[in-house]
Design a protein with these regions (language model features):
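Extracytoplasmic
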Residues: 12, 17-37, 43, 117, ...
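Extracytoplasmic gate region of multi-pass secondary transporters
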Residues: 30-31, 217-260, 264-267
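Helix-breaking motifs and short loop linkers at transmembrane-helix boundaries and internal kinks
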Residues: 42, 74, 95-100, 129, ...
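Conserved MFS/SLC helix-loop-helix module at the cytosolic interface between two early adjacent transmembrane helices
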Residues: 61-97
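Intracellular juxtamembrane helix-capping segments at the cytosolic ends
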Residues: 114-128, 320-333
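Helix-loop-helix hairpin linking two adjacent transmembrane segments in secondary transporters
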Residues: 131, 137-189
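C-terminal transmembrane helical hairpin of 12-TM major facilitator-type secondary transporters
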Residues: 280-328
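A late C-terminal transmembrane helix in Major Facilitator Superfamily
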Residues: 332-369, 376
Length: 403
């Protein structure tokens, strides 16, 4: 029985790892192929930006609806359904050559990708005794997918056919992950430390309608935590390159050093810091790593070009925040509504991302890059203040790891 359970956990981890690598690569494709889309379809800047907007819209819709389905029905089947949607959408990319089809399909691939990412993080605490370690190593694997695809495709992708070939490869990864997950589901066992109703939530269909109190102060504090964090992390990933070029006059090679450093330390940090996250638990880890990361990040931007290197270094500590925040949320809700609560919080917080990206261009036109970019460190500081207030004010309902 123990050997069967161990094999099940290994298969599940391999399944999650393969899928996370594919999801990481999927997330990177927009940036890599945007110039190719622009030339191939003769797109304007507005049409290119619509691809990003559709991606975030997909995140919002899928997280809002998908996590509710996950709390109503058997989570394993919901997860497989989401994975199948992602894979079918990838095949649409492979077999079509039309901007508007790409635009609509982007909603499904990116929405399903983000939801799969969240579902994997909801599964981990139910099956693995060291959720902090497992979650952060899986995000490390995702980082390999993101960074690896950027490096390789950035060198070899010269036309639209590479877009189709890449998505066919991602479909193959999804298929392998699905097969492994099917085998793992027959062997892996829910942890005994979880409640009986939690086990039923993950392994049998739930008849009770899940409810998340929308007037709960905890929910809205968590929305603010994720919302301001999204602006801080995603803002750097989306805008640092242009900031370095337009504000400091760097060429593309110089500017890319800082962005690559941030992305690289993010990937490394999730592997190196994972044992500490497991040792300290979500709350303490967020306080310690969030504090160090926020200070480095803020000083790096506030003090200008001489300290930009600190922004890159901050990725080492910022890296664990998002995966650990996903565990952190689950501590404040019963397992029977953990998926719904997580989806509600992240989907509402995604509006911060959408609003920021829609407005930031206008802000820098009016205020300039120097003042406009200050929104990012201010957002990180607000994130850290709110999450500390939440930790001190409200005790978790359950603990995932030490706190």
């Amino acid at each position: 029985m123990k050997d069967k359970k161990k094999i099940g956990l290994i298969l599940m981890y391999l399944s999650f790892g393969i899928v996370m690598a594919g999801l990481g690569a999927n997330d990177a494709l927009r940036g890599v192929f945007s110039p190719i889309f622009k030339d191939h379809f003769t797109l304007s800047s507005v049409q290119i930006s619509m691809i990003i907007v559709m991606s975030y819209a997909g995140n919002l819709i899928f997280l809002w609806a998908g996590t509710r389905l996950a709390d109503r029905f058997e989570k394993k089947k919901v997860m497989m359904g989401i994975l199948l949607i992602w894979m079918i959408a990838l095949l649409v990319y492979v077999t079509t050559d039309n901007y508007y089809v790409l635009l609509i399909t982007m909603l499904f691939t990116m929405g399903a990708s983000t939801l799969m990412n969240t579902m994997i993080n909801l599964f981990v605490p139910m099956y693995f005794a060291a959720p902090g370690l497992i979650v952060n190593t899986l995000f490390f694997v995702q980082g390999i997918g993101t960074t690896g695809s950027q490096m390789i495709l950035g060198q070899v992708a010269t036309g639209f056919s590479w877009w189709q070939k890449t998505n066919l490869l991602l479909f193959s990864l999804g298929l392998i992950g699905l097969i492994l997950f099917l085998f793992a589901g027959k062997k892996a066992v829910v942890l005994k430390s979880e409640t009986t109703d939690a086990k039923n939530d993950f392994d049998s269909a739930s008849k009770a309608k899940p409810k998340v109190q929308m007037n709960s102060p905890i929910l809205w504090l968590l929305v603010l935590v994720f919302g301001f964090y999204f602006i801080g992390e995603h803002g750097v990933l989306n805008w640092l390159l242009l900031y370095c070029k337009d504000q400091f006059g760097m060429d593309s090679n110089q500017a890319s050093i800082y962005l690559s450093m941030f992305s690289g330390t993010m990937m490394i940090g999730r592997l190196v810091m994972a044992p500490l996250v497991q040792k300290w638990g979500p709350s303490r880890s967020i306080q310690i790593f969030g504090g160090i990361g926020t200070v480095l990040y803020a000083v790096g931007i506030f003090c200008g070009k001489p300290t930009l290197m600190l922004v890159g270094i901050s990725g080492l500590f910022v890296s664990i925040l998002y995966p650990t925040l996903l565990l952190f949320v689950q501590q404040y809700y019963p397992s029977s509504i953990a998926s719904t609560a997580t989806g509600t919080i992240i989907s509402i917080a995604t509006i911060f991302d959408i609003a920021f990206n829609l407005l930031f261009g206008k802000i820098i036109d009016q205020m300039g890059y120097h003042l406009g970019f200050m929104i990012l460190p201010v957002s990180m500081i607000i994130f850290y203040l709110i999450v500390n207030f939440l930790i001190k004010k409200y005790k978790p309902l359950r603990k995932l790891g030490k706190n």
